[in-house]
From Swiss-Prot:
The modification Phosphoserine is found at S115. Its main location: nucleus. GO terms for biological process: DNA damage response; DNA repair; mitotic G2 DNA damage checkpoint signaling; positive regulation of double-strand break repair via homologous recombination; positive regulation of protein kinase activity; protein localization to chromatin; regulation of double-strand break repair via nonhomologous end joining; response to ionizing radiation. It is found in: Nucleus; Nucleus, Nucleoplasm. This is MRN complex-interacting protein. Residues 122-150, 209-245, 282-317 are annotated as: Disordered. A motif (Nuclear localization signal (NLS)) lies at residues 148-151. Residues 223-259 are annotated as: Necessary for the association with the MRN complex. Keywords: DNA damage, DNA repair, Nucleus, Phosphoprotein. Belongs to the MRNIP family. Pfam families: MRNIP (PF15749).
């Protein structure tokens, strides 16, 4: 039988792996792992192929373990060196942090405990005890300051109220003096509900005696005709003196002779000033009684001195400025100055009252009667 071929164990110079190759005459061989060609330098074992392969496995395992151990040792040495180099710096940095952290935690613990105690006790009795003592100490100055504040309030109120009190006293004195004295005619007209009763004694002091006698005669009739007086009060404005009321009362003096003349004089004023009734209805009401006045009274003429107030107050001041024909007709048709009969005078008055209408100026209304 032929002898088995011998093999040798070789190691690559590049990858440092153990391999089994057959023995040859040439000294060159190629690595099975990396494929590099190299020459024979050293044989790590010789034998059969099977024995060489087992030996190669053992060598590779040992080499791997050694390489791992070397790597571990290198890593450990590097880590040890790093720890030796960085250790003191890290220890110096870590020591203050470790010292600060427990201090912070300790303070937080105390604060948390205090907050819990405050929440349970409702504001903390121990904390409130100190400010309570502090507030109790300044109590006496506050107590002494209270009367000072009251005195100051009184001092401030007294000078303010002083002039008012004096004014009120003066007002009381003036009221008492005014009660003793007769009232002014304007005051009496504003304060009295009936102008006819309260104005007479006030005006009697200022007017001549002849006029006061006539007014005294009309005072009793003014009480009887309360409705007519109320109508005249409505005609008089509140802020002005009662001049129109006086004129109406002077007109009411002729009631002794004409009977219903006051009713005739007061009626034509109400529709003109109030504007409630139409002018035609007023004309119809004026025409009937004024046509009867000459039959009932039987008067022909009246003196111009007594009828002068009628002409002054019957036409309103507004229509005079607006109606241009009123003053001309009042001057031309004035029956009391020329001596025309009473019927013509009443017709002229009705024509004057109709021409005062702003919307019907320039027309002749004599044919309607």
């Amino acid at each position: 039988m032929a002898p088995p071929q011998q093999a040798r164990v070789l190691r690559c110079c590049c990858c440092s792996l153990f391999q089994a190759h057959q023995v040859k005459k040439s000294l060159k061989w190629t690595c099975k792992a990396c494929g590099k060609k190299q020459s024979f330098l050293q044989a790590y074992g010789e034998g059969s192929g099977a024995d060489c392969r087992r030996h190669v496995q053992k060598l590779n395992l040992l080499q791997g373990q050694i390489s791992e151990m070397s790597l571990r040792s290198l890593g450990e040495s590097i880590s040890a060196n790093e720890e030796e180099n960085v250790g003191p710096w890290q220890a110096a940095r870590a020591s203050p942090q470790e010292t600060l952290q427990p201090s912070k935690n300790r303070w937080l613990k105390y604060l948390e405990r205090d907050s819990k105690e405050l929440g349970l006790k409702g504001g903390g009795v121990c904390f409130n005890s100190q400010p309570s003592s502090e507030t109790e100490k300044p109590d006496p100055p506050f107590s002494t300051g209270l009367p000072r504040k009251r005195k100051w309030n009184q001092s401030t109120v007294q000078p303010l109220c002083g002039p008012h009190v004096q004014d009120s006293r003066n007002c009381e004195v003036t009221l008492k003096s005014l009660k003793a004295r007769p009232l002014h005619p304007t005051w009496g007209a504003r304060s009295s509900p009936d102008c006819s009763t309260w104005d007479l004694p006030c005006i009697s002091e200022e007017l001549p005696p002849s006029f006061t006698q006539d007014r005294a005669g009309l005072a009793g009739k003014g009480r009887e005709s309360s409705r007519e007086d109320l109508d005249t009060m409505e005609l008089v404005p509140r802020g002005e003196p009662p001049c129109p009321a006086q004129q109406v009362r002077t007109m009411s003096k002729w009631e002794q002779c004409l009977g219903n003349s006051s009713h005739l004089d007061t009626e034509p004023l109400t529709p003109l000033q109030r504007g409630l009734r139409p002018i035609q209805a007023a004309q119809a009401e004026q025409g009937a009684p004024r046509a009867q006045t000459p039959r009932e009274g039987g008067l022909c003429r009246l003196p111009g001195a007594r009828q002068s107030p009628q002409t002054t107050h019957t036409p309103m001041p507004g229509p005079k400025w607006l109606c241009g024909r009123i003053p001309e007709q009042s001057q031309g048709t004035g029956p009391w100055a020329e001596g025309v009969p009473l019927v013509k005078g009443m017709q002229a008055r009705s024509s004057l009252m109709r021409l005062c209408d702003l919307f019907k100026t320039g027309e002749d209304f004599d044919d309607d009667l």
